[in-house]
């Protein structure tokens, strides 16, 4: 007996209003992004000269039918105030608002909590983007696929290695129709190397009923607790109502919604062959920086520094930064506001943040130099390259520091002629001796 899929009436193809939601998380999330997230929320960390969330917003602004964007998370409202004010000037055709959750509600729970605001004006489609994703965001192509297939949901997918696939949500799809047949979040065994990229397009009249159904399933589930003896049998079934209701409110798209959509909805996947990676750990900002800079170079962005004998493109230099003409930069380097790079310095595959100093004849490779940090003369700060295709986020493996990007937190000082290799250095540390493969507390 074949499964009968209910079909909605075909839309007229013109495409109605669309809204976008960017999920930004909160202070208790993104802890793997430390020490950088100790001073700046991860969504506002600069990658390729702009906050991570700016890249999402730029892609959204290129979808003509989107005029409203919501940032949903549980940071303090003041955190995004300046960003929203600046973005209103840069993206005048898009209204941007921050909606603060009273607690962490999950990727679907936050959407459902603010459903009235999102559904105001009766949008036809809703984009949902995770802010910690680095990709080209083919939103117009996803919208076109949704209209062609009369889809109720479209997920962005990409291919990764078989070994890496089980770290993500895995998609089984029909290669001809692109229909999603099965979805499993982080399966224990290999199912597919087509994975969830964390970018979704939902029909507005399907998304919230699907979340409501997931909440109902969670609420109706028998509330049983383990017990140690017959003496506490009666009390073992008594679960604190506040604790239980709090758990019921945490609803996640990946674990609670997408699997059911694959079973009974018109659910399709748009597979991208362009770049994609997550920005989970602090070190993952370096390959993301390279990918965004390469994209800017391909699009002929005027933000990039013009190539020269000492500028190997792509390189971003903030207008307020000071770079000596004899310093050599690139490829894939971002220099932040008021940073200084002195004579004879070499910077490659790195991010130099606001007010940092790179003194003369020093060398910075595969590293992030934190805000107001200083790299002394003739010093060498070096990390290990992370392949763009690698999705490993481990910092320590078997008790040993994994060789990876070197990160200096805020206001760190590396002395003259000091070598720092494969280290993570927490803020306000002064390094007076050579160090390698350490987390410096």
Residue ranges and their predicted role:
Residues 123-127, 134, 140-148, 160-165, ...:
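Catalytic-core segments of class I nucleotidyltransferases/pyrophosphorylases
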Residues 1-18, 90, 120, 127, ...:
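Eukaryotic N-terminal low-complexity, Ser/Thr- and Lys/Arg-rich leader segments
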